[in-house]
Design a protein with these regions (language model features):
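Basic nucleic-acid-binding interfaces
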Residues: 1-157
């Protein structure tokens, strides 16, 4: 069998997922002390559930994680636990954030999840380079080719 397989009592498994989720209102809050604190909280909660983090990146307005989730946990139940418990822990550590987010919910409702097969290396590289790609996309969006109000082509200065 392959070395990246895991096993439980009577099960051998290799369940890897690429997960992306964002703070409520997609606020750009994940930087500096918040970034380090949120990273510690997410690692702690994953360890408690036996979820292995292969790669992770905290961008200012979203989180990318490549994780192995045991088959005894469903993705939806694990993510409900991760987002719910981490919200409470984030608000305990950073009480000032309670005023920006109502109802003690730090994360938005949805998430993106994709299974990972033979393309694991490519996804790990994508996650590692995510911050650079966000900066490039922001720079590209500074100049719009067409005026959003008139629809006419803008002239570069």
């Amino acid at each position: 069998m392959r070395q990246d397989n895991n096993s439980l009592a009577h099960t051998t498994w290799n369940c890897k997922y690429h997960i992306v989720f964002a703070p409520k209102y997609r606020r750009q809050i994940i930087y500096g002390k918040y970034k380090a604190s949120i990273g510690q909280i997410l690692r702690l909660l994953c360890e408690r559930n036996g979820v292995e983090i292969h790669e992770a990146e905290a961008c200012p307005d979203h989180i990318h994680m490549l994780v192995s989730i045991p088959p005894k946990l469903s993705i939806s139940s694990f993510m409900g636990y991760l987002k719910g418990k981490s919200s409470l822990m984030i608000f305990d550590r950073h009480a000032n954030l309670k005023y920006k987010y109502g109802n003690r919910k730090f994360w938005c409702r949805g998430l993106y999840v994709d299974t990972v097969g033979r393309n694991q290396k490519r996804i790990e590289e994508y996650i590692r380079n995510q911050l650079q790609e966000d900066v490039i996309a922001d720079q590209l969006s500074l100049f719009e080719e067409y005026d959003p109000f008139t629809g006419e082509k803008n002239k570069r200065k």
